[in-house]
């Protein structure tokens, strides 16, 4: 009887670990920003279970070792599950992904930071020390630099092959891949995410998502970088 007990305890612990990991990875698909932007948490247990979390700083899913219990919902069994839950978080410049630093130890000033969860700029009181570059002098500067450029609404419509029986090559914008792809159009019905040629699709939907290549950085950021360069020289 005593020899059976350790086996049951082992099976029970494995069941609990599997349940915890399963629950953590069952996030619904879509823009789950509150879940995906949580920091990675391997939990207090000591198992080493290969899992995946969404990294706000690289804006991609990365592997980590889950301890097997507790932790948080930013925890997925597979890379595919992580991508499925978090792919809709739009890409923004690196400094806009940083968490705001509200420590106050110097001259107080009102500034704005980009909130990756809400994709908006919010006001905060900057203390002037240990701050990062996610801070802007006003809301307009913040939004102009950080807010993702949006394509027309119909670019986000799903692929629709239509209602008839023809077989015509058309192109649609795939928001998940952020690229234009070919599909077979049946000749009638469908939606506006339907282009006769690849060039029109790219011009309408892809270019609208890209930020200007030579976009100037806000003066505040340039000033901070010049100051850092001067300090290194002395």
From Swiss-Prot:
Domain BPTI/Kunitz inhibitor: 36-86, 96-146, 155-205
Disulfide bonds: 36-86, 45-69, 61-82, 96-146, 105-129, 121-142, 155-205, 164-188, 180-201
Compartment(s): Secreted
GO biological process: blood coagulation
Residues of the site described as Reactive bond: 46-47, 106-107, 165-166
GO cellular component: extracellular space
Gene Ontology molecular function terms on file: serine-type endopeptidase inhibitor activity
Coiled coil (UniProt feature): none
Signal peptide stretch: 1-22
Subunit comment: Finds in a complex with ABCB1, TFPI2 and PPP2R3C; leading to the dephosphorylation of ABCB1.
Protein name per UniProt: Tissue factor pathway inhibitor 2
Organism field: Bos taurus
